[in-house]
Structures are given as C-alpha cells and as structure tokens.
Amino acid sequence: MEDFATRTYGTSGLDNRPLFGETSAKDRIINLVVGSLTSLLILVTLISAFVFPQLPPKPLNIFFAVCISLSSITACILIYWYRQGDLEPKFRKLIYYIIFSIIMLCICANLYFHDVGR
C-alpha cells in the first residue's frame, strides 16, 4: 500500500495547496499589502476630490469620488464574502482585478484633480 505522504491526487506532483477557506502566510501578507496600499490611495483620492484645486469642490471631482466609493464598496462586499467562505477561491482573481481597476481609477482621478499634463 502506498504511503499517504506521497499521494499526488491526480496532480503532476505533491499537492500542498491549502484547503478551501485556509490561507497561507504568504497570501495573508500579499492581501495586507495590497489592501493597505489601495486603502491609502482611495483615502488620498477622496480627500483630493474635495480639497483640490480650490474650495468649493468641482461637481466632476465629487462625481469621481462617488464612483470610486461605490466601486470600493463593491470590492469590500466581495472581500467580506470571500473571507466568510461564501465564494470559491477562483473569485480571488476577480477581487484582484476589481482592486486593480479601482487603483487605475484613483490614479486617473488624481491626475485630473492636480491638473497633470495641462
């Protein structure tokens, strides 16, 4: 009888991936770094929307801030569901894509707010 430690379960090699709902230390660090940087960028963008270029803020700046806030709420809901175990692990790529889109939207908004390129 073969040893339990050497079973490959149909994969090309030993399968040491975490089970559903478990995360490795590397994944937790990546999630913390991505989440922290994204949160900081969103905060800077929302503050910039209301402060720059002068007070009172332009309506387009407020529109940018609302769009970024709504996108962020959507991402937070997906992250909450993922952490609860309601979503399959394949949705992690979707969450990363949404976060990347939010980061790009924040960069575009900040470039617009600060009149870069004019």
UniProtKB/Swiss-Prot annotation:
N-acetylmethionine: residues carrying this PTM: 1
> Which tissues is this protein detected in according to the database?
Widely expressed.
Cite a single Pfam family from the UniProt record: DUF2678
Which UniProt keywords are given for this protein, alphabetically ordered? Acetylation, Membrane, Transmembrane, Transmembrane helix
- The main place the protein resides is membrane
Tree of life domain: Eukaryota
The regions listed as transmembrane in this protein's record are 32-52, 62-82, 94-114
Q: Which GO terms describe its cellular component?
A: membrane
InterPro entries according to UniProt: DUF2678 (IPR022564)
Instruction: List the membrane topology term(s).
Output: Multi-pass membrane protein
Subcellular location(s) per record: Membrane
Q: What protein family is recorded?
A: Belongs to the TMEM243 family.
Protein name (database record): Transmembrane protein 243
What is the scientific name of the source organism?
Answer: Homo sapiens
